[in-house]
Amino acid sequence: MDMYCIRGGGDGTDILAEEMAREYGMQIEVIVPPNHPRAKFTSPASVEVLIQADPAIGAAAHKLCKRVPTHFYTLSLLQRNYHIARKAHTVFAFGKLCADKKRVEGGTGWTVQLAIDQGKEVFLFDTNTNQWYRSENTYNIENSCLKKVTSFKPWGTLRLPTLHQSSAVVGSRDITPATRAAIKNLFQRTFCLPENIEQVRLELEGLHL
């Protein structure tokens, strides 16, 4: 199964996602700025590539009612987050959903907003309620203009989400036992569904194993 996981080289959610991706044989792409501790072990993104994110970060800051960081390292992490979202088909986030159901708290919220602004689908495991949510767009007429509004809706009774061909997994450094279990279950149900097991079996037969 040709799938790969994109992550940002941090602790907590990032580390566990990388461990699970390796366990299931996924390709892994780690995106870090040049001054990140992980840059010693993987090729960092160049400054020229990172700064391409600056206009998007400014737009996200406006929607999040936040200021763009002025500290170089903090800004470089947001630039990294933009490129994580850009390269992913779908983003799986583990964080705290705000009361307005439109934003996610902390650094994870920046990545989620950057993904939404790029039209990416986002699945959120809300660590407040330990429930899955999905991003959903609605369109309103405001001042004679069509305006898109994205909010998070409860997953409901549908089969829980599974990883896609190109998935980014993002979240907090500090993860609870419930969040840890949710991350592990995400990978497990992706690769243990009957249709996925059958695909792996056929690929192994093709290799005469």
Each model region followed by its residue ranges:
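Acidic/glycine-enriched connector segments
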Residues: 1-206
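Conserved ATP-binding/catalytic motifs of P-loop helicase motor domains
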Residues: 209
